[in-house]
């Protein structure tokens, strides 16, 4: 958006920034200046001339010979090709030797010339040839008040035009008034004065059928206007920001748009059938817009119509048929508030954007509609003549202000600042956001209510006001400070809904949750239990029993995915399993005591461990991958230290948790980890190994310990030692790990790094070698060799006495 500094000074006469200071300050306020255009005065040899005579060029149809009075006593002959030259026009004349710099940046010097056989001593200039605008439709026409022979620079002013990038949340800054509000205190803004217009209601001039899309609409009929070129000052204002003047009526609406940010539209009143305006959203017809493109209007688009057809797309663009022309004598001036969502939808559907839609889409000031209309009417009466025949309004203007509360302590907490409450009030008052209370604000106040003006549509809540305080106070004035982190006591309670907590952990472990039907086929359930709960009247063989656990349901999901080409799976489910109770375990609570319902967490993995890649061999997941997942789950529940993994058979290990309740310690069976056997895989039609784990949710919740106990890192070095034991094959390696950890508190961690099984030798007991890597550390000091040897001796002695394990001899 282009902003003229001279235009800004109409609103802020005291504006004292130099160009670089203004650019820096606007950017600092969040209105980034993308480019700066310095508009300089033309060469002194460009003077004011008056065309006295125009005659055709004898040798060229498109050229004309102009005799121009430049105040030198003799008329100057100039050959000109502009289509708009006429006798009596005041024009800029570049005399011999004048150096011109065009808008394009090209520089050229005027020299005597002979054009198609006719002498030409100078050039009648268009605005773009003088570097004043990009208008090249004809020569530049000057006011009659200009004195012949005087340098044109005398009647022009230097200006600086800023190209500002306005963010979507700041539609209030899409005008010169909006930018002026940023540069000066609210009370320093000078608003142009215009007579108050009394808009009547119910006169029949307006009918709004879609009040949601157009809550407020005004129409003013002005008769007896004279449409013609705009005064030089008005045309110059528009040229400075890159707009091409058209005629005085259209130029006034554009001037109001860029001054106040309120789009207006003028219709030729005699082209409106029925002399009335209807705003509706059910039109379905073709429409020729001002850009001479035909659009197909659809129901749902906000359209302004006369008694017969659409004459404008509401908030977007007017129609060509009702446009103001040189023959127009009576106009209808529209000033309205269109719903941003409605304009955005219509503009997007039609792929049509305009200066008006750009502002309506983002939100114009609803309280500015009437004032902008009044000022436009005053300008039209002054410049184009005529008189107001009627002025009518429909609907009500939205509320003028919003009330938003601000807590000074919250501001300083967010910004890391120490701004006083009274300073915050003063900062916000600069941009017309005023405290509701008229009393002086004390610095220890808890909350302050502010009245937000209607043009700040982006301010809805406290954090928006905090942003404004930071912006006005200056981000560069915020002193760097340590990050303040609020400290809250760690809750030791069980999460409000424990199954959801388990779900969040599993998702964090890269598993996908599935939801399955608890009713399954009997053949599938038989693979996992004989104590099945049968459905009395099953609707199909697929739904004849309740699942005893979640395994059959998960395996069905695995099979479905494999048949559809998805063979790498990590799935889990938290749900219920159902089994019959043995007679001995039933209570006396009624028929339901014959059944046992358990809440379970089940998980399966299958397929490749990692995606296929050129730099590594394919490896499938195995039993230990799933065991690792279970260990991570137990660790997050703070249960790993209390858990033990016991081998049930070659394919299954059990998970047991040591629990202490009421002073009694017990070992509870929490679940299993297993490789699904081949017979079960065949039942479910699976052709690759699947690994399954199942845990009792109720038991996990009972044993769960919330909270993280912080353990600071040791200040002293860690010592590593390796031990290789030979132990009977039937003893799980986990027992050796647990025993090593329990031997001495200075044993920080134990892990297996090698296993060697030499097989069975006749006449000798069956043994295997398990190599352990131990990390030792003492929090009270550095361990010397004597201390290290003592710990290692304890581990070796305990392994020998408890497990019959001996150190492997090399």
Curated annotation (Swiss-Prot):
Coiled coil: none annotated. GO terms for biological process: phenylalanyl-tRNA aminoacylation. CDD domains: PheRS_beta_core, tRNA_bind_bactPheRS. Residues 399-480 form the B5 domain. It comes from the Bacteria. Disulfide bonds: none annotated. Residues 714-808 form the FDX-ACB domain. GO terms for cellular component: phenylalanine-tRNA ligase complex. It is an enzyme of class 6 (ligase). It catalyses: tRNA(Phe) + L-phenylalanine + ATP = L-phenylalanyl-tRNA(Phe) + AMP + diphosphate + H(+). Its EC number is 6.1.1.20. It is found in: Cytoplasm. Tetramer of two alpha and two beta subunits. Belongs to the phenylalanyl-tRNA synthetase beta subunit family. Type 1 subfamily. This is Phenylalanine--tRNA ligase beta subunit. It comes from Chlorobaculum tepidum (strain ATCC 49652 / DSM 12025 / NBRC 103806 / TLS) (Chlorobium tepidum). The gene is pheT.
